[in-house]
């Protein structure tokens, strides 16, 4: 539970003198499996025990060689620590070291865990970008870390650190890789953004060792042959290099295409020294003849971020990838299998669930390579749904009674055509008036003493023509009724009566002349909902709520009790009672929006809202959940899924009474609400203050 929530609940408890109990609820993680594996480490000599680090500070572990994974702990406080490297102390399988840098919180440094990854302590180089760490094989008390501003050394397992590279040196900075001679802890190689460097006296003196390398090479990895310390490998932007003489001279390997030259790691087979692997951003490459010939042994689309070779069975390869999680091979890279059970760490932007089929769900990811995944079997398998998407991951995804709808970022609306297995655009229909030819309205001549020829009068008839074009407005929300579907967009409210194929703008203001009417009809709409019988429709703009009690034919405007800055979510409890969730907390109206009462969650910023059977659930910006069973009058806290940070989406299914929560980084979770929705819990009453 976040600090924000604890403060709010503490204030309520002091005010009301009540104690809050939390009903036990069991959330089930259903995927999608995989994610970014930034770093991998194994207990030396035993790859049954593995650890992986992510790009947001999470540490997972496996005790069965990677077949099953569990979240162990987290590094940092703001969920933006990129765990660049991890090592396990050869003297103790419970002692781990990790280095990190942060995306925005000015953190980073060297961390240590003494309990196998469950808890972590910052032990040095606080606030620095630390991308590499190495432990001296001949003296494990010695640690060498490479940071943005230099190389640091510890001789007491990380208790104290001191700089061993010249301060403010023009080239000895921005370190990406560190390697220590297996027999001499004072012989150290360090790779920078600009070529490799070497010291043989523990850092007193440094020499640039780049003879034979392309100048200006960013050295990302350095590996020393454990059987022959003068035999060194290095990878750079310009390619992969080998030195037979301790870095004095380098020869570039041939055979790996230029496109795959960004090699993150080089690993030597512990049993076959002539076999070397190059983990690149475009697949894993292998040589069995000391670099004379190379071949690609994974799909080129795989980006390999980390790798471990089993020392007992060197045909067993464990790959940490971008997006795809852990991929394993038991035959030296001939075939692979995904091994992500318990590791679901995809970045979910939005999610939708089939309201009638508990086994169907879809998630939107941040990856352009794999922007959407669908499951039809409750998360056991996931299938990409990308065909027809032309602008990357959509902003939102919606579940209609007939299937999925996606709202692309630039605007527009797509429906998924399961027959064509593709996303298809929908149409916007506009009506325009067009004058017809003049016609005679008088055909009977009247004769009088004043006139002998009365001319026939003429009139201009107005006809309405329909024009069809691709739907282009940015969609913020959708609602699906029995007879009409609605889309709340940045350009107004739209309705469809043909299952979403064609959409027309809804006239919220009376049909009369004037710019004010046009402004109302085209105002940005943030949310929309429909009553069960389709008679009532609610649509929210940033300033007011539009209400229709006759299926959208006529509308009434209701003023909101605040000026929202962030998201708005709406839940009509019945035709009179409406729950409104926002960054100002929760408000309730029991007279169709004419007056509002602020609920007890006024101090919390609400991210999402989902109705459940006999209740409604809201999620806060910190990922906490609250449940109301009386239309928003009182609220009680719920246990959320075991995920840190915010929830990117909160959805519900009527069938099975399920609540579905999408974690921003830790996958999709499902809660059976049968017991939870009927259990009793102390609640937080609504505020007695009414706002008109």
Regions found by a protein language model. Give the residues of each.
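Bacterial N-terminal signal peptides that target proteins for export
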Residues: 1-12
